[in-house]
Amino acid sequence: MEADNYSPEHSDDGGATPVQDERDSASDDEGNEQRSEPGSPEHQSEDEHSDVEDHKHSSDSGSDNEKGTEHDSEDEHRPRNSSDLENHDASDSENEESHNRIASDSEDDGRRQKNSDSDRSPVKGAASDSDEEPVRHSASDSEDDVPRKQQANDSEDERHIKKTASDSEDEAPAKHRVSDTEDKAPPKQVASDSEDEASPKQVASDSKDEAPPKHAASDSEDEAPPKLAGSDSEDEAPAKRKVSSSEDETPSKHAVSASKVKKSVGSEDKTRGKRAIIDSDDDDDDDVPVKRAASDSEEETHPKGKASDSEDEAPSKQPSDSEEETPAKVAANDSEDEFPRMKRKIVSSDDSDDEDDRKPLQKKKKSPRRSSESDSSDKVDGKKLQASESDEEGEKASKKKKSNIVSDSEDEDAADKSGNKKSRILSDGEDSDSDAASEKPKQKKKKSASSDSEEEDERKSKTETKSADKLFGSESDSENEEENLIADIFGESGDEEEEEFTGFNQEDLEGEKTVTSVNRQQAAAADSDSDDDMKSGKMGDYKSDFDLMLERKKSMSGKQRRNRDGGTFISDADDVVNAMIMKMTEAAEEDRNLNSSKKPALKKLTLLPTVVMHLKKQDLKETFIDSGVMSAIKEWLTPLPDRSLPALKIREELLKILQELPSVSQETLKHSGIGRAIMYLYKHPKESRPNKDIAGKLINEWSRPIFGLTSNYKGMTREEREQRDIEQMPQRRRMSSSGGQTPRRDLDKVLTGEEKALRPGEPGFCARARVPLPSNKDYVVRPKWNVEMETSQYQGSAKKGVSRIDKQMRKFVDIKKKNRFGHAVKISIEGNKMPL
């Protein structure tokens, strides 16, 4: 059970209520004090007035019974870890002892109060300190028996002093409220309060004695069971606040605990039959008036309290009070205090129940919630039966109530984090192994739900892998599929290749396997419609199926047109495009016929200007591609029947247009056959060099996506480009330095002077001049300066150094010009330029 109360993944986020912080700070002190002081006065803080009346007469029987109850309380931790069979044994043994204990009910109630208080502190300790404290406390329970019995006989004055000390130290918020009401009617109110605390817990104990009702008691637990450490002090606070009269100070927590106690009571209709038989057998002789009092007081309080936790408080309080003292006064006092609070809390508890009702419906779990009407009606019958139960069950109830409140009160926190519910259902199946025998029906439901979801995930993962294999192929088939795709698009590469395609770098081809595997993983992640993101609990990262579908559509929109079903955004353009494609195919067919009949094939040439004009329109390019212009272009570029290439002008224009077209999908390339035509031109010996270059670029661009390589260098950052260059350099160096040349170390060591050059006659000496080794250094080509530097300073120094040479050269050039004669010798009148 400690594992249920404290699980590391659901740690306290401190988000419950402000009072929780006080409880957390007090919980450590309370747990430590209860372990260090076995008979500490806080155990007796609430039973002192009842001890005044009854302790003298029944201390011996009370101590004997307490040993039984203590033994039962120690056994309480074990049945939760083993099975509910032991729970039934414990309850039966307690029922057998009920006749002995009724004489000292108030004393037993007081000591049960101690046990419930001390049992709460381990739970708080489990949440706040460590999991070891409940274990230690379970051991210390048996050790504390004797000191508690001794201190039960202490003087009343000592108890008053110790009570005030313990109240101020540990449980000031809750127990001072108890003491406030104790001032009004001390003996009766204290007894009723202590029993009141036991009886609502008793309510929860029935639902816990048979663990299937435990889960039915908090149906939302099936959706979000162990958020257990979510509010550490809440497991104590709701129980104590049912005791306290000033409940309106903490309405929020009461609303939570109210709705949860209501749920636990509502679930007990499953166990009523068994309980009624056991309890009526044990208590018929003693508790007949109690039952009547309970039924009377319940009928008064039910109309107001059906949906609130005051239903648990008032009715259970009155029958338990009537066991010892006059029930009318206590019922009056309690109901006066409780009825206003009932009215206040009905609304809040109903709201919280409605919220909890909605959540299982939204999550579509298999344990449907009972309606609130059936809960309240079951509670009416159940409380009459439970009022007759002996008070010996109070101790058992206190511990089971504690765990029930822990699990139930967390449902509100679990509602805030509903994204984690599925994972919690799976973990609850593991955590609830402590209730293994009793929880089998519920665990079967949970296991079936978890197994169903796991099967769905497996199916989805299988379909994802299949779709990924369809898109990218498995690793074993990736190379074959790439080869097949290349063969389909560009044709089989036979031995008749005149020119080898050198489009790819070797590094790109080497890295293609890793790239394709990465792409496959990305595609599988993109195609996954599973709820893995939900299960991880990271709601921020979660993307709905609709978002994933949109992203897929966007990624496909570049390759495929969205509306291929005939509905287009430019209806008249479609007509133009289709007519153009029809004309192109007809012209190609006519040219083939003319060529086969040995006539000049000029139809394509005459139609070429019109085709180029339309294909260059930017807004029609996508429409052309979708309408099948690629197959028409292939018809124009394929050789004629006499194996002659089409006109050079046709090839040039169409290759340029193909280069300008947007990215073409692999399906289009495969079905149109344009790749084979381009590859034929690329390999053809009579094709012009510019056309071969364009064809090589096209092949490179179209085949890169098949190998998962990028062709967009503009999109690469500078660092990526530098990294790519660095990765390519060593292979180039290896390629350049490989060959039958002298080893590199000789030149390096000779140049550095470490090793002397080989002399003639020494091994390894070659008696001939050698070509120098290629450099092993990496040189990065420095690009031209795009920014004009301030060249004035450089120009000034250059002028000073070169000015004389420039002057002499200019003079020399001028003299040459003067000495040269024109075509006709001009005779100057003055005779200056006449040749002598």
Swiss-Prot record:
Species this chain originates from: Xenopus laevis (African clawed frog)
Tell me the name of the encoding gene. Answer: iws1-a
The family database entries (PANTHER family) matched by this protein are listed as: PROTEIN IWS1 HOMOLOG
**Where found?**
Nucleus
Composition bias (Acidic residues) maps to 476-485
Q: Using the UniProt annotation, give all residue ranges assigned to the region (Disordered).
A: 1-542, 714-746
Record function comment: Transcription factor which plays a key role in defining the composition of the RNA polymerase II (RNAPII) elongation complex and in modulating the production of mature mRNA transcripts.
Write out the similarity annotation.
Belongs to the IWS1 family.
Q: What is its main location?
A: nucleus
Name the GO cellular-component terms.
Answer: nucleus
Stretches with biased composition (Basic and acidic residues)? 20-36, 43-122, 133-148, 157-186, 206-218, 288-309, 370-386, 458-469, 533-542, 716-727
| Gene Ontology biological-process entries | mRNA processing; poly(A)+ mRNA export from nucleus; RNA splicing
Keywords, A to Z? Answer: mRNA processing, mRNA splicing, mRNA transport, Nucleus, Transcription, Transcription regulation, Transport
Ranges for domain TFIIS N-terminal come to 631-709
Q: What name does the UniProt record give this protein?
A: Protein IWS1 homolog A
Short name of any one Pfam family annotated for the protein: Med26
Q: Which classification does the entry list for the species?
A: Eukaryota, Metazoa, Chordata, Craniata, Vertebrata
